[in-house]
Amino acid sequence: FKNKKYLDLDKDIIWPHINKKKIKGQIFDDQIFDIGDGINEFNLAKKKINKILKKPCCFLDRDGVINYDYGYVGKIKTFKWMPGVKKAIRYLNKKNYYVIIVTNQAGIAYGYYSEKDFYNLNSYIRSNLSEGKTYLDKIYFCPYHIRSKIKKYKKNSQLRKPGTGMLKKAFKDFHILKSKSFLIGDKISDALC
């Protein structure tokens, strides 16, 4: 293959290995796209694949939506699930929605808990959900606040809701169907973003 500029999957890889009985197969009901030999076919296949991969997203605020908000919940010992949330996330997973948390975390900016505490809590949340075959696709957070006493967190950030920074990151990172997506929050800042 070293001398060839382009490889043809069928001609150069699959058929020679079939003839040598060095290839195994498995039947799938999914679609496959042959992107052909040219850039036009590649671009067409890319568009089709992106369309297939796009799916709606349910964005969730965290405190007050998935857990009780006792004020600055940043550690496992202060986290308590809201009733029905795990079941709702499982339903969204089964309906082929991305489920993404977008959460302001001023408690980090104020020094009530650390980013490490926050990540430990995320691990606990994910682990707890996985017991019920439920999952989150991503957790985005904003640790910044203009009134922070900690220099590295003291700033005005578009990540902080009602800014749209976390949503923009999600749209960049995932194939999200915007027209069918929604956000569930408990504050005006959630609705405004």
Q: Model-derived features: where do they sit?
A:
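Short, solvent-exposed loop/turn segments at secondary-structure boundaries
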Residues: 2-5, 77-78, 111-116, 154
